[in-house]
Structure formats: structure tokens, C-alpha cells
């Protein structure tokens, strides 16, 4: 999906496919809670040069203020993201956990359980709403969700997202 944003008479095309990278898919992440999952993902992203040293603190702080858990019709997900100053290169990190963890729901901060988190590395704040909308549309599609849940190959998961977003 290519989104178009109009700001001050300029048209900006955003190709979210470029944010996906096969190195940024973790299918067996083991964490007992949200903090442990954040620590593992932040370390991996930092080692690959996608985020800077402040990312873990930034994402943890933002998640406390603005929770990102979403209950969709077919699958509960979370879309954690930090402020842009912690992001070196735009990315989407796909994290599938071994076990569910509790996160707070977007909007009302009620606790919910998720096994799939999508860490969004957004450099331009204007792109945030469009990317969040694209994810919500994907996860309302039962066929896409079924394919994602059943797939265990990173290459095929990468292809699934880049063909559908």
C-alpha cells in the first residue's frame, strides 16, 4: 500500500515496504513481560544501527504514556514506537513471542495479552498515522492474519508484509 499525504501544497508518497527488513523479524522471542521483550528488541535494533542508545528508554517511556495494544477482530497486536530522535533508520521490527505478555490497550490503558508486536521506527512524525492505519487495515483482513499466524519462515513473512502493506 502506498499512502499519499498532502502537507502545505506538497504531495508526499510513502512506501512502507522499504521499512521491512528480513533481519528485523524475530519469531521465537522469549520474554516474561513487556519490558524484557523491549530490552531484547532494542538491543537487536541498536546492534544493527536502526536505533541509538536512548531507544529503549524512549520506547518504554512513550508506551507508558501512550499504550499501543490493539484488539483487532482476528488477532491482538501491539505497535510500540518511540519518538523520532531515537530512530536512525526507518524500520518495522516484527516480533512474535513464545508466550503472551501483558500490555496496555491503546485508548483506555486496559491490560490485554499479545503474542505479536510490531515495533515501528518512524523518522518523520507525519508518516506515523498512515503507518498505524496501514497496520490496522492489514489486521482486519482475516486471510492476511491467518497467513501470518501460520507462517514460520522469515523470508515468507517478509514477503507477506511487503506484498500487502
Residue ranges and their predicted role:
Residues 2-165:
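Cytosolic covalent-transfer regions centered on His/Cys nucleophiles
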Amino acid at each position: 500500500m502506498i499512502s499519499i499525504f498532502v502537507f502545505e501544497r506538497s504531495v508526499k508518497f510513502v512506501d512502507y515496504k522499504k521499512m521491512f527488513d528480513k533481519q528485523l523479524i524475530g519469531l521465537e522471542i522469549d520474554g516474561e513481560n513487556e519490558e524484557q521483550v523491549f530490552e531484547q528488541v532494542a538491543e537487536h535494533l541498536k546492534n544493527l544501527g536502526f536505533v541509538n542508545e536512548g531507544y529503549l528508554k524512549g520506547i518504554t517511556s512513550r508506551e507508558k504514556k501512550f499504550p499501543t495494544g490493539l484488539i483487532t477482530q482476528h488477532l491482538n497486536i501491539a505497535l510500540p514506537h518511540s519518538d523520532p530522535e531515537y530512530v536512525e533508520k526507518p524500520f518495522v521490527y516484527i516480533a512474535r513471542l513464545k508466550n503472551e505478555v501483558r500490555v496496555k490497550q491503546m485508548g483506555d490503558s486496559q491490560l490485554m495479552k499479545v503474542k505479536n508486536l510490531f515495533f515501528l521506527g518512524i523518522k518523520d512524525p507525519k508518516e506515523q498515522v498512515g503507518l498505524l492505519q496501514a497496520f490496522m487495515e492489514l489486521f482486519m483482513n482475516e486471510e492476511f492474519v491467518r497467513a501470518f499466524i501460520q507462517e514460520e519462515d522469515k523470508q515468507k513473512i517478509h514477503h507477506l508484509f511487503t506484498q500487502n502493506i
